[in-house]
UniProtKB/Swiss-Prot annotation:
Residues 144-163, 360-369, 531-545, 913-931, 1015-1036, 1151-1170 have a biased composition (Low complexity). Residues 196-217, 249-259, 724-747, 1106-1127, 1224-1245, 1496-1505, 1517-1529 have a biased composition (Basic and acidic residues). Prolines at the third position of the tripeptide repeating unit (G-X-Y) are hydroxylated in some or all of the chains. Type IV collagens contain numerous cysteine residues which are involved in inter- and intramolecular disulfide bonding. 12 of these, located in the NC1 domain, are conserved in all known type IV collagens. This is Collagen alpha-1(IV) chain. It is found in: Secreted, Extracellular space, Extracellular matrix, Basement membrane. GO terms for cellular component: basement membrane; collagen type IV trimer; collagen-containing extracellular matrix; extracellular space. PANTHER family: COLLAGEN ALPHA, OTOLIN-1. Keywords: Basement membrane, Collagen, Disulfide bond, Extracellular matrix, Glycoprotein, Hydroxylation, Repeat, Secreted, Signal. The gene is Col4a1. Glycans are attached at residue 72. Alpha chains of type IV collagen have a non-collagenous domain (NC1) at their C-terminus, frequent interruptions of the G-X-Y repeats in the long central triple-helical domain (which may cause flexibility in the triple helix), and a short N-terminal triple-helical 7S domain. The keyword Glycoprotein applies. Trimers of two alpha 1(IV) and one alpha 2(IV) chain. Type IV collagen forms a mesh-like network linked through intermolecular interactions between 7S domains and between NC1 domains. It comes from Drosophila melanogaster.
């Protein structure tokens, strides 16, 4: 009975609905039963629903209340319609969501209802008053890594940065004095245990330990360290010329040589040549005696490459005295000595095991400041302030001031009026990528999920569109530790290059003195000379109880022991030794989630992964650097005699020729006159670093000028060819060219003998002017390391230093050695009650049986459609492509080689002595001086100031994570960069003419297996062609689809009689046969009679089941109406960064908001007016080290520097003055004096930040660490995946057994395997061609088979007749998915290329020309519609450009992306018949077609020829079981077999199939596992009942029918008598057991449904299974002779929409659910594809009657959420013991 107020409310609503002019009946939506009114259809003329024509419309408005027709109405009465008795129609489609009903009047107050469930989280309340500043919180956990911020504008000079990367190695400093001895360091860690010494010599009996005899000579000592580098020797005289080396390879043909120059006189030595490549070592030749000719001293050559490794040196001098020999054998025990004195305290004992937790320590020192906290919540909006008085009028407009500080937050202004729509602007140019949006609001923390099951590695899907980075959600609670997943397949990553070293951190503060180290391991035994061994120290106190160790790794299972004798009883026996570990119990109830363990130690690096797939072709690279200059070509042949000057001959003008081929690159022309200034071009890309120019004289420092404004565009300049310019200066040294070809024979040079004169001596010149100071020299190379100075005296000890601050925590120490065994701990507390053990182990192991392989298992069911696999490995290298188009013209080449040296000038007279020139370059190092006399000790110095920061030490071990450092200063926003120029679009190439048909090429090699193509469109059926000539034999085809069941064959001919054999003796009973293959599924049985009520018990939760296959995607549901705004969702998965969208249109200015977080970088602002000069700022912090400054002015003459190393080759000098006497060689100069060291130049300005370095190459794999200690026993792992089929084992040992008794007749075996192929039959005669069969119906599309190997080319067929276009075929059913292809073989590993120098980032290349049409791509997936970008701002109209010249054809474009499959176009006219194409490759097997109409039986053909023997095909899939054949002939009696070995004991498993099935539901997303001894048949989803056409059909949760293998919101269709079935066209519903996932606010759909559907498994049990119920909160015991499977709660029945529902038989295991849920099931609307928990769903459970008396009235009570399970009866599922 409804309450009074509800009835009144219903009456009011009904009355309101009937009064309305357009009222509707109530409509049930979903199952919520909400009343809907038709307010939305008010005053509309159109009908709300279409009206069926089979019904008449009665206008009831004109029939008054008294004019109603009588019950037996005739047709003549007004408003009367014939009575239509129609059958009840099917349930209609779900109606649209009705409008919201009118609000009813307020009802009377009802009775106080029961307390409701805990309400949902309320809306956030109003902001409170700002609270007082709280105490400083403890440092938070490390947050997740933030989203990378947008590139901000360049900032002002920031605070001092952290230390830069290690610079290049500096010059070796002068060796410092030897430092004082340091304080003793902290105690080191224990060393490794030394090896045991040899046995010592016997000691003497008495206590007089005299000195032993002299030992044998020790082992030869190791070679001493290399001595210091010797002084550089003086340069030796030039040696004699060596013998000629072996003849080199002949060079390539050089270019034709230039005409030879006229010779004028003796040639001078040429310029030094370019540094050559490192030569090969010369082969040894006998050295002939030569004489030395002194040549002119050449220029100093470049530093040569390192020489080859020298030969092994002579044996060194005898080594130092060897180390002491090993200790001798242990002597005999000595006599007892006198009692010694009290010994010193022994060393502390080894560290005991970890003790219990100590008392809390003292408060630590204050920590470093924590990181800046997250922005707090915005405070409450303050009240508006009072309006101030009006200010004075402002003055004239001033110049824009500098940016002011950030103003306070303004009030929210009133929204302005809506403006008129602006005119659509022209589409702007593509904008730059927009800035990344801010992070979204964080999601609510999700519910703590159950421990995940180990998932199988999914195949990688296609790369989806690049998603935008989602917001960072609040971190959810840590989930339970999942199981260790299998190792994934090797990734296809591309090997990155080795990364650069990281930036060093700040130097740490001085640490306090470390604690005393652990005790070192015992050292090697010391020498015993006169001392006596001390007495052993007393044993240390027992350590405190340590924590439990980690589980060790499980040992291997031992063999079964021999069964022991029955023991007798004894009263005084001592307790026996500890028994062996028992067998593992059943899995326990899942424990609570443990605390998060410490992070594991870093594992070894994995093996190198497979080579990654080739990346996409990158843009064309930049022009590479010029190659090295090749070796000089061979000398050309002498030229022919010279001819007259061709320039004097006037050439006759010939006819215009055809355009010639493009000429070679011309010689560089003279520089033209400078043109007028052109329009400023766009800013170029970052250019390459130029060659170092000639040093100019240092200029005066200019004052920095202000940045000028951009000038106006200049007038386009005219280009007038200028006069030839002067000869330029020599260019920079070119790179070494490639090896040139031998030149052609050159022209003969003219050498006029009358021009060869001795040069006349000139007059003496005037003294020259003082030369300009030369440019400062470049920094010299680092000097060679100086010699080690003499060891100074030890200075006096300085005063103690000031006590440093407390140091940071030291790095975490390495794991100490295992401590000594501690005192046994106290006995632990009693453990929890154990789980019932498993069945006992089998008996003693019998003699080994004879092994034989078992039969092949049946084929598995078709798997669900897998996810799209990873991109396969890169296919084999394709055929060479066609010749590419002509490339772009190359860049201008570098300057050519230096010209030939000029003629020597006439020798002048000796000039006067010039003025003193600038200081010369530092000479070579001087001869080292002799060692000085050792000085006296100096007086004690003052305490020194703190020393400089030392050089970085070697890389230390990885430390523990440090505390958070203080947050650095925020950088200043930098200036925005200028916009780069847009690239020039390429010119589209003209479409070429269609080429002629080429000749048929030779057969190419067989290609690799390609990926399966997408199904093409259904083609039009053609007429039957003529019969082709028989093709050549094809290659083996792919395995065929499983064929239909064949008809029984005819009886074969009788076999030959077998050989007679002796009668065998009666055998012993044989062992039980192996279990046969699984038979075909039986037909469904008739419904059984209702069983007796059973009892139930609740087993413990089994281990998590294996991950189920992914279900198919459901059908797309219809678009629902927009729901209300949902609660904030859970944190989404981070998507990949989306591509940046276009620049949006400017929005309407908003009201001033609250102070936001620091905004992203602004767009570049316009250039402001120059501001006034600011005040002098505070002294800034030290800046970063600047880049290398420009060369400073010439310094004062420094002191004599240390001897430098041999310098690099100098710049080529000016030509020397002519020698006074030709051909006279100068003497070797004396060694110059040591030069002065210049002063250090001024510090340069800070350089620009360089581009990021290239990622370094992958480092070498580290050495394998020492093996770790054995771990404790691990937790038993979850059930592993079914492993691959093992290889056939070796045949077992065959021992002839005794004769067995006759065995029981075995059951019918399953179908045997396919027999081996028979022998090759004889070749038959060729058969005649049969009659063409009838055309079959088109079949459904088959699965995409793997691409077959390319068949051999067939003979060309006869041309067929023109066919008429056939009717389009019927669309076939989609076939099952093809098998996943085998993984391709790894490609050959390429040779390692040389590491290239890092190139600068190249500019984007010009767009290529339109490439040739690519092959038709596979149909692409439908992409999501991208958001429409806002139109950009209209750009300025540019000047009209001149017509550009035709560009050179671009590089061929890359192959286009696969195109989207266009919709089929209209049918075209029949085309002309084309020529016969070459025979195509064999197609993939087609999908299985529909069964065609049975044709008439053809005439029997003649016997065909015997075909050639085909290759043995791969075994096909197992066929259907055939019909039983007719009984064969009785076979001959077989030979007597050998006596078999005794069989192995039978396993505890069943030797027969019981057929008793049991279903278990996990009520979670995890698939449950069958109990031990049960056989898993299938897994699925837990179906409770189906509501169809308002009738409910219930499933017994204990029967297999409640576990369906696939899930769908509507797994059924409805069929009527008119042979028509409908699917998803009615309002049918399904109900499923659900999980413990949180109840959603709105219906869920698509993949979100998965987390709410319970999983199940169907098992075959060895014996009958029942459920028993206690009707109390105590779990009932199973009856005698039964054992428990699981425990649970007594679930009886359920109801949902209307009167639908069902129940469970109490003896069925389905009445005992393992988890209690107030709403244990979820309702799914079949047609809509959504699922939800509705208020009408009710579950009924057995009540706990423990505290109530029978036959007394139940007491009404409301049970809250926390107490529900204590009022529900418990149950247990039990199975009868089969043992």
């Amino acid at each position: 009975m409804l309450p009074f107020w509800k009835r009144l409310l219903y009456a009011a609503v009904i009355a309101g609905a009937l009064v309305g002019a357009d009222a509707q009946f109530w409509k049930t939506a979903g199952t919520a039963g909400s009343i809907q009114d038709s307010v939305k259809h008010y005053n509309r003329n159109e009908p709300k629903f279409p009206i069926d024509d089979s019904y008449d419309i009665v206008d009831s408005a004109g029939v008054a209340r008294g004019d109603l027709p009588p019950k037996n109405c005739t047709a003549g009465y007004a408003g009367c319609v014939p009575k239509c008795i129609a059958e009840k129609g099917n349930r209609g489609l779900p109606g649209p969501l009705g409008p919201t009903g009118l609000k009813g009047e307020m009802g009377f107050p009802g009775m106080e209802g029961p307390s409701g469930d805990k309400g949902q989280k309320g809306d956030p309340g109003p902001y409170g008053q700002r609270g007082d500043k709280g105490e400083r919180g403890s440092p938070g956990l490390h947050g997740q890594a933030g989203v990378p911020g947008v590139q901000g504008p360049a900032g002002n000079p920031g605070a001092p940065g952290i230390n830069g990367k290690d610079g290049c190695d500096g010059q070796d400093g002068i060796p410092g004095l030897e430092g004082l001895s340091g304080m003793p360091g902290p105690r080191g860690y224990a060393g490794q245990l030394g090896s045991k010494g040899e046995k010592g010599e016997p000691a003497k009996e008495n206590g007089d330990y005299a000195k032993g005899e002299k030992g044998e000579p020790g082992w030869r000592g190791t070679a001493g360290l290399a001595g210091p580098q010797g002084f550089p020797g003086e340069k030796g005289e030039r040696g004699d010329s060596g013998p000629y080396g072996a003849k080199g390879p002949r060079g390539e043909h050089g270019l034709k040589g230039e005409k030879g120059a006229s010779c004028y006189g003796p040639m001078k030595p040429g310029a030094p040549g370019i540094k050559g490549e490192k030569g090969e070592p010369a082969s040894s030749f006998p050295v002939k005696p030569t004489h030395t000719v002194m040549g002119p001293r050449g220029d100093m050559g470049q530093k040569g490459e390192p020489g080859l490794v020298g030969r092994k040196g002579e044996p060194g001098p005898e080594g130092d005295t060897g180390l002491d020999g090993q200790k001798g054998e242990k002597g005999l025990p000595g006599g007892p000595g006198d009692r010694g004195r009290q010994g010193n305290f022994g060393p502390p004992g080894s560290t005991g095991q970890k003790g219990d937790r100590g008392e809390p320590g003292l408060n630590g020192l204050p920590g470093n400041p924590g990181q800046k906290g997250e922005p707090g919540r915005a405070g409450a909006t303050g009240k508006p302030g009072l309006l101030g008085p009006p200010g004075p009028p402002g003055g004239g407009r001033g110049t824009p001031g500098p940016p002011g500080p950030k103003g306070p937050r303004g009030y929210v202004g009133a929204p302005g009026p809506q403006g008129l729509n602006g005119v659509d602007g022209l589409p702007g140019p593509q904008g730059y990528n927009g800035q990344k949006g801010g992070a979204g609001l964080p999601g609510r923390p999700g519910n703590e999920g159950p421990p995940g099951k180990k998932g199988e590695k999914g195949t990688a899907g296609l790369n989806g569109p690049k998603g935008s980075i989602g917001p960072i959600g609040h971190p959810g609670p840590p989930g339970p530790e999942g199981q260790k997943g299998d190792a994934g397949l090797p990734g296809y990553g591309i090997q990155g290059s080795k990364g650069d070293a990281g930036i060093p951190g700040y130097p740490g503060l001085k640490g306090s003195k470390g604690e005393r180290g652990f005790k070192g391991n015992a050292g090697a035994p010391g020498d015993s000379k006169l001392g006596r061994p001390g007495t052993p120290g007393a044993a240390g106190a027992p350590g405190q109880k340590g924590d439990a160790g980690r589980p060790g790794t499980p040992g291997q299972k031992g063999d079964m022991g021999i069964k022991g004798d029955v023991g007798g009883k004894c009263s005084s026996c001592r307790a026996g030794p500890k028994g062996d570990k028992g067998t593992s119990g059943l899995p326990g109830i899942p424990g609570k989630d443990g605390a998060r363990g410490p992070p594991g130690e870093r594992g070894y690096p994995g093996e190198r992964g497979h080579d990654g797939i080739n990346g996409q072709t990158g843009p064309p690279g930049e022009k590479g650097e010029d190659g090295r200059t090749g070796l000089p070509g061979a000398t050309g042949e002498p030229g022919k005699p010279a001819l007259c000057d061709l320039s004097l001959i006037e050439p006759l003008k010939g006819d215009k020729g055809y355009p010639g081929a493009p000429g070679a690159k011309g010689v560089q022309g003279f520089k033209g006159a400078e043109g007028l200034p052109g329009i400023p071009g766009p800013k170029g890309e970052f250019g390459f670093k130029g060659e170092k120019g000639l040093s100019g004289a240092p200029g005066n420092d200019g004052t920095p000028g202000r940045a000028g404004r951009d000038g106006y565009p200049g007038i386009p300049g005219q280009s007038i060819k200028g006069e030839p310019g002067f000869h330029g200066r020599d260019g920079a040294k070119g790179d070494k060219g490639s090896f040139g070809r031998s030149g052609e024979k050159g022209e003969p040079g003219s050498c006029a003998l009358d021009e060869i004169k001795m040069p006349a001596k000139g007059n003496k010149g005037e003294p020259g002017q003082t030369g300009m100071p030369g440019p400062p020299g470049e920094d010299g190379s680092p000097g060679e390391r100086g010699y080690t100075g003499l060891k100074g005296n030890t200075g006096p000890q300085g005063p103690p230093g000031v006590e440093g601050p407390r140091g940071l925590n030291g790095p975490r120490g390495e794991k100490g050695n295992q401590g000594a065994v501690g005192v046994p701990g106290n006995p632990g507390k009693d453990g929890l009650r154990g789980i019932p053990g498993r069945n006992g182990q089998p008996g003693p192991r019998g003699e080994p049986g004879i092994s034989r392989p078992g039969p092949m298992g049946p084929p598995g069911l078709n798997g669900l459609q897998g996810e799209k696999g990873d991109r396969g490995p890169t296919g084999p290298i394709g055929f060479p492509g066609a010749d590419g188009s002509v490339g772009y013209p190359g860049d201008r080449g570098d300057a050519g080689l230096p010209g030939v040296s000029g003629r020597p000038g006439i020798v002048g007279e000796k000039g006067d002595v010039g003025p003193i020139g600038p200081a010369g370059v530092a000479g070579p190092p001087g001869v080292p001086g002799i060692d000085g006399v050792r000085g006296r000790d100096g007086a004690k110095g003052e305490p020194g100031s703190p020393g400089l920061v030392g050089m970085p030490g070697n890389k230390g071990d990885r430390g523990a994570p440090g505390n958070d450092g203080p947050k650095g200063f925020a950088g200043v926003t930098g200036a925005p960069g200028k916009r780069g120029p847009a690239g020039i679009p390429g010119v589209s190439g003209a479409k070429g003419d269609k080429g002629a048909t080429g000749l048929t090429g030779n057969d190419g090699p067989v290609g690799g297996r390609g990926p399966p193509g997408a199904p093409g469109l259904m083609g039009i059926k053609g007429d039957q062609g003529l019969a082709g000539a028989p093709g050549q034999q094809g290659l083996d085809g792919m395995p065929g689809e499983k064929g239909n069941q064949g008809f029984p064959g005819l009886d074969g001919p009788p076999g030959l009689p077998g050989d007679a054999s002796e009668k065998g003796q009666k055998g012993e009973p044989g062992p039980s046969g192996l279990r046969g293959d699984t038979g075909p599924a039986g037909t469904p049985g008739w419904p059984g009679e209702k069983g007796l009520p059973g009892l139930a018990v609740h087993g413990r939760a089994g281990p998590p089941g294996e991950k189920g296959d992914q279900g198919r995607s459901g059908i797309d549901g219809r678009d629902g109406i927009n729901g209300e705004k949902g609660e904030q969702g859970l944190q989404g998965v981070w998507g990949q960064p989306g591509e940046k969208g276009s620049v949006g249109a400017p929005g309407i200015p908003g009201a001033p908001g609250m102070d936001g977080l620091p905004g992203a970088a602004g767009a570049p602002g316009a250039v402001g007016y120059p501001g006034d000069r600011g005040d002098k700022g505070e002294p800034g912090l030290s800046g970063l080290p600047g880049l290398k400054g420009e060369t400073g002015p010439v310094g004062l003459q420094g002191f004599t520097g240390a001897p430098g190393p041999k310098g690099e080759r100098g710049i080529r000098g000016q030509p020397g003055l002519p020698a006074t006497v030709p051909d006279i060689r100068g003497d070797k100069g004396s060694q110059g004096e040591r030069g002065y060291t210049g002063e250090k130049g001024e510090q340069g300005e800070r350089g620009l930040t360089g581009p990021a370095g290239v990622a370094g190459a992958k480092g070498d794999r580290g050495l394998q660490g020492p093996p770790g200690a054995s771990g404790l026993n691990g937790i038993p792992g979850a059930k592993g995946d079914i492993g691959p089929r093992g290889e056939i084992g070796y045949p077992g040992v065959t021992i002839k057994g005794e004769k067995g008794l006759p065995g029981r007749p075995g059951r019918n075996g399953r179908q045997g395997l396919i027999g081996a192929p028979g022998l090759i039959g004889e070749r038959g005669l060729p058969g005649l061609a049969g009659e063409p069969g009838l055309v079959g119906l088109p079949g459904p599309i088959g699965p995409a088979g793997s691409k077959g190997e390319r068949g051999l080319a067939g003979s060309p067929g006869q041309p067929g007749q023109d066919g008429f276009p056939g009717a389009p075929g019927l669309k076939g059913d989609t076939g099952p998915q093809g098998f996943k292809g085998e993984r391709g073989l790894n490609g050959f590993e390429g040779q390692k290329g040389d590491k290239g120098d890092r190139g600068l980032q190249g500019p984007s290349g010009l767009p290529g020309l339109v490439g040739q049409k690519g092959d038709t791509g596979y149909p692409g997936l439908n992409g999501n519609d991208g958001p429409v970008g806002a139109p950009g701002e209209r750009g300025f109209t540019g000047p009209k450009g001149r017509d550009g010249r035709d560009g050179t054809p671009g590089l061929p474009g890359q192959k286009g992306e696969p195109g989207m499959l266009p919709p089929p176009g209209p049918k075209g006219e029949p085309g002309q018949p084309g020529r016969n194409g070459p025979k195509g490759e064999p197609g993939r097997p087609g999908e299985r077609g529909l069964i065609g109409i049975q044709g008439e039986r053809g005439e029997k053909g003649e016997r065909g020829l015997i075909g050639e023997t085909g290759n043995v095909g791969r075994p096909g899939p197992k066929g259907d079981r055939g019909e039983p054949g007719e009984r064969g002939y009785e076979g001959a009696i077989g030979l007597i077999g050998q006596k078999g070995e005794p069989g192995a004991p039978a396993p505890a498993a069943l030797d027969y199939l019981t057929g008793i099935l049991i279903t278990r539901h996990s009520q979670s997303e995890t698939v449950p596992a069958c109990s031990a001894g049960h056989t898993e048949l299938w897994t699925g989803y837990s179906l409770l009942y189906v509501d169809g056409n308002d009738y409910a059909h219930n499933q017994d949760l204990g029967s297999p029918g409640s576990c369906v293998p696939r899930f769908s919101t509507l797994p059924v269709l409805s069929c009527g008598q008119n042979n028509v079935c409908n699917y998803a066209s009615r309002n049918d519903k399904t109900f499923w057991l659900t999980t413990n996932a949180a109840i959603p606010m709105m219906p869920v759909e698509n993949i979100e449904i998965r987390q709410y559907i319970s999983r199940c498994v169907v098992c075959e049990a060895p014996a009958n299974v029942i459920a028993v119920h206690s009707q109390t909160i105590e779990v009932p015991d199973c009856p005698n002779g039964w054992e428990g499977l699981w425990i649970g709660y007594s679930f009886l029945m359920h109801t949902a929409v209307g009167n639908g529902g069902g129940g469970q038989a109490l003896q069925s295991p389905g009445s005992c659910l393992e988890d209690f849920r107030a709403t244990p099931f979820i309702e799914c609307n079949g047609a809509k594809g959504t699922c939800h928990f509705y208020e009408t769903m009710t579950s009924f459970w057995m009540y706990n009657l423990e505290s109530s008396q029978p036959f007394e009235r139940p007491q009404q009570q409301t049970i809250k959420a926390g107490e529900r399970q204590s009022h529900v009866s418990r149950c247990q599922v039990c199975m009868k013991n089969s043992s």
